[in-house]
Amino acid sequence: MHQFQQDNQYFIFNFDRTFEQATEFFQAEFWQKQERVIGSAKGRGITYFLQTEDWFGVNCALRHYYRGGLWGKLNKDRYRFSALETTRSFAEFHLLQRLYEAGLPVPKPIAARIQKGKLGICYQADILTEKIENAQDLTALLQTQTLPKETWMQIGRLIRKLHDLQICHTDLNAHNILLQQTEQGQKCWLLDFDKCGEKSADFWKVQNLNRLKRSFEKEVGRMNIQFTEQNWADLTSAYHQ
């Protein structure tokens, strides 16, 4: 792992070297000129999927951090700087690395950057993470098919592993769970650990699960996904084992 500074930019890479193109790696235009953009997804901004296996060992997802809500209308992507390790991209990078090393199915963090403004008070942030191949988010799949009991139980066990590490996923919802098709069957992954972190005690774990259930119920009405109380019972049964 290598952390370094170039002018008003700070980088961390999951490699023991410095890259001359460090700045360009976080610019969509660079990858477009290289003809290495292989897809994209829209959220608050655009996440670009990049062909980088020959450079980084895996293909990557490039994401810029944007604010949501009312603040996002006034200030779309600047955050107040206090310490490097607590910036949005560096904090998510380190949390992903911790979970990855613990064996949880999360994207491997590849690199993160922050760029300070002229006064050094605010910063903008970006992150590069592993792209999970041959995968769809849960809501996309549930619009066209039901899932077997074992898949719901796998999701429950995954969330339990996360909670056993005292990590609270503050945006735990059906869109942040991916299902990957492998030769061994379906594998569940968790995404988007921005603003997530360690939390003491246990009271929040039930609240976290309830948040996930509400997201499923919301998408039943909004996207007509196939989700039942029995699915939830299978998930929570595995969680409590």
Swiss-Prot record:
pH dependence of activity: Optimum pH is 7.5.
Disulfide bond entries: none
SUPFAM superfamilies, alphabetized: Protein kinase-like (PK-like)
Enzyme class: transferase
Main location: membrane
Family: Belongs to the protein kinase superfamily. KdkA/RfaP family.
The protein's name: 3-deoxy-D-manno-octulosonic acid kinase
Native organism taxonomy: Bacteria, Pseudomonadati, Pseudomonadota, Gammaproteobacteria, Pasteurellales
